[in-house]
Each structure stands twice: as C-alpha cells, then as structure tokens.
Amino acid sequence: MIPYKQLSLADIFQDCQNKFNNDKPAFLSLLETHIDIDEFIPISFRNHFYASTGRSRKYPLRAFLWALIIQRIFSIPTDQLLLTFLVYSKPLRDFCGFTKVPDASKITRFKQDFLDDLQLVFDKLVDITEPICQAVDSAKADMTIFDSSGIEAFVTENNPKHANRIIRHLKAYAKANSFDKNYDPYKAAYGSMPSHASANPEIKQLYINGHFCYVFKFGIITNGLGIIRHIAFYNKNFIASHPDITVEKKSDSPDEDKSVHDSRLLIPTLKDFFLKHPLINPKTFLGDAAFDTAALYPKLLTGNTFGDHKHFDKAYIPLNSRAGLEKQDYTINENGIPCCPHDDSLPMKYEGISKLRSGVTRYKFVCPKIKWIKNVSTGRSQRHCTCDDPCTASSCGRMVYIYPEKDLRAYPGAIRGTEEWNNTYKIRTTVERDINHIKDNLCLAGRRTQNEKTLHADLILAGITQLITVVLSDKINHHEFIRSLKPLIA
C-alpha cells in the first residue's frame, strides 16, 4: 500500500520555487553568484542617476548596466533585439532587475546622459583587474600595446557604392587619357573624397583594413594579455585638451596620413592613461612602424614624460622602411646591427650587454668570423679571427660597442632581429585581435547611428564587458576565459 502524504500550500510553493531556480540558465546563475555589479559603480554615478531633482526612476541603474553588458556578452547586435529578449525571457528580465521593459529611447538616453559616468566605471574596473592580470602573467601584464581604429558611423559616405562609383570613374578617366601604370586610382579617390561626412564634420575619413570609411576614430591600449587598459575617443574635446597635437590636411597617401596621425596621438594618449592609473607602471612598449619617428623614442624611454621618473625601459617598434638608420664608420643593417665593413650582408655577432662604472649601458658586437680556441697551456679560450681579409690588426677581430643612449631609435632597449625581439614583438598583434573582438563580438560594428555620444558609450561598454569577463574568470579560477566567456555560454 502506497502511503499518502498530505500536501500543504507551503510544499506546493517550495516545489514551484525549486522548479524556478532549477530552470534559471546556468550562465545567469554564475553571474549572479560571482559578480556584484554594485561594487563597480562609483558613488558619483549613483548620485547622478538618482539625483534629488527631476522625476523618480522607473528603472534601476544596475538593470540598465546589466542589460547592456548581457547584450555584449551574448553578441546581441541591436538595442531593439535586446529589448525583445527581455520581453520574452523572464529569467533574463529578473536577473537584470527590470519589472517592466524600457523602450529603446530609454536605452539611448541612458548612454548619452551618463557617458562620463560609464567612463568612471571602466576606469575603476581597470584598477580592479590589474592585480588579476599580474597574477596570470606578470611579463605580459607589464607590456603596453597601442593601436587606433574607428567606429563606422551610419552615413551615406559609408555605403560601398559611394567609394566604388568614384574609383570606377577614375579608372575610366585614366584609361581614356592613357595614363601610365604608376597611376593609382585608389589614392586618387582618397584625395578626391571629402575629409569628413556631410552629416557631421566629426566623422572623419579614414583608411582601415584596406577600405575607405568615415568613422569616429579611437585609440586603445592593451597589455600583452589582450586586456584593455585604456580607451581614448579622438573627438574635438580630446584635441582641445591636448593643444600640442597638430592637425594637418590630408595628403594623397591614406597609409601615410594614418601613420603620421597615430604617431602624434600616442604620447597624449599614454599621458592620459598614466594620469588615470598612477599605480600601473608597465616597462615595455609595443607598437607598429607608424611610431618609428626619432622624436618619439626619447619621450618613451627617458625623462619624466609620464610622471616622475616614469618611462618605458624597452620599445619594440620595427623600423619604418621609408627611413633608414644613420650610418657610422661601420655599416648598419635594417635591424640596427653593425655589419662587417667588407661585407654588408654579414651581420656581426651580438655578445651581450655590459655596463660601465658610470652605469651607462652598452651592447657588444664582435666579428662574425671569430672562433674560440682553447689555449692548452693556460686552459683558457681566446678569440681568434679566421677572416681572410681582416679589417683590423687585432687577432681577436673587430669589436663594436653600441651606446643606446646616443641613438634610442636604433637601440630602443632591445636589439632588433634577435630571438628576444622576434618573440616579444609577436605579442603586438593582440591589440589588433582585441579591436576585432570588440567590433565583431561586443557589438561595436554595424551600429545604425551617427550620434557621437551613443557610439562613444558603446565603445566604453565594450571595454566594461571585457573587464567583467576578467573578473568572472578569476572568481571561478578559469583564467583561460579571461578574454571571452563564449565557452561558458555554450
């Protein structure tokens, strides 16, 4: 006989509650358990949002933040689609903290009205995640990598047909007038296009990833782990706060214009970064050949550019092919390594670093044709030059000492072409992958707006989402998810 059990209202309620808790998506439960969004909201943001004047808030601050972060974690491309998910998903709605789903205008107004406050949330998360990055890989965490890109605005000029029509006409014109093969219709098209969009002069023309576009330009600083440390939005406010930046008219070369502009933006961007985060003190800088200018190296590697005695020890920047190194009484190859005076294709051997009593560092290079031969009587090995046509009377062969302080561009704290240089410089591509990640996966690309504040807020929210990812991966002790939570969602 099956024993019966009297069901009470409390039992029924408990069963329903257990069913509800078990049905909650595991990823949302993970966020709810390990992330307290209130810890990252500065009191000034809270006071601004819940100001004593004006109407009372129907929707809580944390609900807006969670909704916009969830949108980027799940790669939901539009705000309207996010709101649709909130309407049909009660667990998602309850997790965010909405009792009623706001309309799209509320989301847009939140981004525009609280842009500066979102920046404070991002800056606070940078400081919180720095110890985590140091614990994961201190060597990569001590690297600073910079690159620039742009957010394409929703303007007529970004329609591919706009540029293709101009290029097609120029090709036909060149063919009709029998121009020679040196004529480049793409450069000619770049020169003939307006420097900014007709809808907004702040939307500038840029050449990114092989195509012309009209964008709001931004700069991004990451560490060697690919974690964002700083975001700079290059609008008129940024230019006004850095009057030393000179803005010149564009030339006929899009690549040259981007390189020149990037090199002028680097130092102001780094100054802002170090000013906001005085406790972060990286020692290694990585950048592409756009930053290979003689004026930049002393600012990066010496003096008080970023604070009292605060500068980088090494700068991994490849030499620009358009500007070679100054030649001394010996020849120098493209990596800054002295070559044999009788054979330019034969680089000398790098034999290490030594310091004088004064503390000055010098690099030692020796003849590539020397051999170490052991003296039987003394038991010691000595250098012997085996060259058939020696350039010096010394039996040890030619030796060259390089003093990097005299030429920081040629010797920026490391020797180009060495295994150390090649292995370290490979890490620079993390910033490019990071830019692609925030555009494609964190919903920065394809935004159907030309409003500067909205796009700026979207950029900051992408950075906030990545840093939330870092915090969560540390809380659950899975640092392999430090850059993306997609495996956890799946």
What residue spans do the PLM features occupy?
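Charged, often Cys/His-bearing segments associated with DNA-binding zinc-finger transcription factors
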Residues: 1-45, 476-490
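Short amphipathic alpha-helical "interface-anchor" segments enriched in bulky aromatics
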Residues: 35, 86-87, 329-366, 404, ...
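Low-complexity, serine/threonine/proline-enriched polar segments
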Residues: 150, 174-191, 329-397
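Polybasic low-complexity intrinsically disordered regions
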Residues: 113-285, 289, 294-302, 306-312, ...
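DNA-recognition alpha helix
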Residues: 80-95
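Basic, amphipathic alpha-helical segments enriched in Lys/Arg and hydrophobic/aromatic residues
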Residues: 423-490
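Major-groove recognition helix of helix-turn-helix-like DNA-binding domains
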Residues: 96-113
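Basic, short loop/linker segments at the boundary and entry of helix-turn-helix/winged-helix-like folds
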Residues: 27-70, 74
